[in-house]
Amino acid sequence: MALQFTRHLSPNLRVYDNMDELSAFAGAPQGILDLERELMAKCELMFVGGQSLYESKRKRHDNIHVFPSSVDTAHFKSARDRSGDPDDQREISHPRIGFFGVIDERMNMDIVAGISALRPQWQLVMIGPTAKINPESLPRAENIHWLGCKSYQELPNYLSGWDVGIMPFALNEATRFISPTKTPEFLAAGVPVVSTPITDVVNPYGAAGHVEIASSAEEFVAKIDLLLSRPKAHWLSSVDAHLAEMSWDKTWARMMLHIANVGAESKSTREGQLV
């Protein structure tokens, strides 16, 4: 969409950082695919936010690189050492099964309702703003707690009190290419997590045993039961080794290396044209 107010610029280098397939989202602006084609033709370098996006677009650009979601490990890892609960979570009993993120058409509400019904003794703590869906359509039960939007700074305080995290994404066009940032954030917080089989979660996280994969409420319940009883020490050690290579600083350094290389090539080309 930025093309609509940047076409008059003549930069030395253009980079397209593509984090989602926005055209598949509910309410996507008309013409967004045409704008993307124009942008890709103009840009010398392209980054994508996950392997599935890379596979979708790699034949459409000759200098495309994949950078999955990174994580502020120190911020979320602080959840492992905190005690006490925020006021609106303090009276919620355990086990607590938590989610944080935008609550929209990408969430499978049947799975949320199913977990609640199958395990009424579990408490589902749901954090995040509602978007593009009617809040009245959210499943309601005594053990489902919709706590609304929280700030980024507050999130570790909530995650520190959760026993298991869930990512109950629907499998639809809006989730086909997502690489959820909350995956490494859950892991950095030390919260075991169960997800539906989103491609960029199954590989690498599911394949490595860092995230459990489930497709139905019944499967979610079985996986959560497993995680509630499983010791965390070995899992955490493996998770931390994986996260050590995923800081935003390291991701930015790798991006800058590509930018510097392309920038040097562009400068050389411009100087050659002046000779």
Put a short name on every predicted segment.
Residues 123-135:
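Glycosyltransferase donor-sugar binding loop
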Residues 107, 153-158, 165-188, 194-206:
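Nucleotide-sugar-dependent
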Residues 52, 67-79:
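Carbohydrate-associated surface elements
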Residues 232-259:
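A charged, aromatic-enriched C-terminal amphipathic alpha-helix characteristic of glycosyltransferases
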Residues 29-46:
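Membrane-proximal helix-turn-helix segments that form the acceptor-binding/catalytic region
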Residues 88-107, 112-116, 124-125:
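Conserved donor-binding/catalytic core segment of Leloir-type glycosyltransferases
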Residues 133-159:
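Nucleotide-activated donor-binding/catalytic signature segment of Leloir-type glycosyltransferases, i.e.
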Residues 207-218, 226-231:
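Conserved acidic donor-binding segment of nucleotide-sugar-dependent glycosyltransferases
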